[in-house]
Amino acid sequence: LQKLNQSIKNGFNENIQLIAGASGGMIGAAYYRELLLETKIGKQKLNDDEFYCDNISKDILNKLTFMASTNDIFIRYQSCEFNGYSYVKDRGFAFEEQLHNNTENKLNKSLGYYYPFEKEGKIPTMIFSPTIINDGRRLLISSQDLSFITSSANNNSSFENVEFHQLLRNQKANNVRFSSILRASATFPFVMPMITLPTIPEVQLMDAGIRDNYGGKLTMEYLFSLQDWIKFFNLHSIRRILFIFSSNVS
């Protein structure tokens, strides 16, 4: 991404509208977006330094392997707090902590922190789509309300998508730790435990790649839902590109 942006004289970053995908690719994309945001608000210069590539490439799984081998049952008796909410510690928490250590805590924010920047178009919108294990549907997560994707104008919706803010409308969903959303989209079996949402009955999440590994289906739904808006801006020669990320190579 750094090379691509450099090759067109820093014109690439300004033309990204949507980031979608699955697994570790979304973690790297989130870090890249965070660096773009810090550039916009004056915290740092352009993010073309190899230092940042090295940060996101650092080991993150050895700590999880150690916890698995020593049995993390005892760890679950511990808890931590974020934004006034208490959470049980597990291997997933260790994953997040290692990610923050590797990236200088740049991603240690709430999901809602990014809402005004996405709304103003300063940074691309990120949509995460972890798989709901209970029924196989996708949970669409963003700092913004995505009900325009989950509802269908012609009433032919397959109901395969669940909107995060609608599901957790009584739990102040935007207060969730952003790294927990990253983990939800990249929770691979046996490596990390499933994420359990505070619902009755409990909703459990796994890797987004189970349903939409490259974010292609979600991108098409996004485009279809906003087709009138896109047509309007195309008439005025205002264009932005959509970019899809995934950590898997086929």
Predicted regions: what they are:
Residues L1-S250:
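Catalytic domains of lipid- and phosphate-ester/thioester hydrolases
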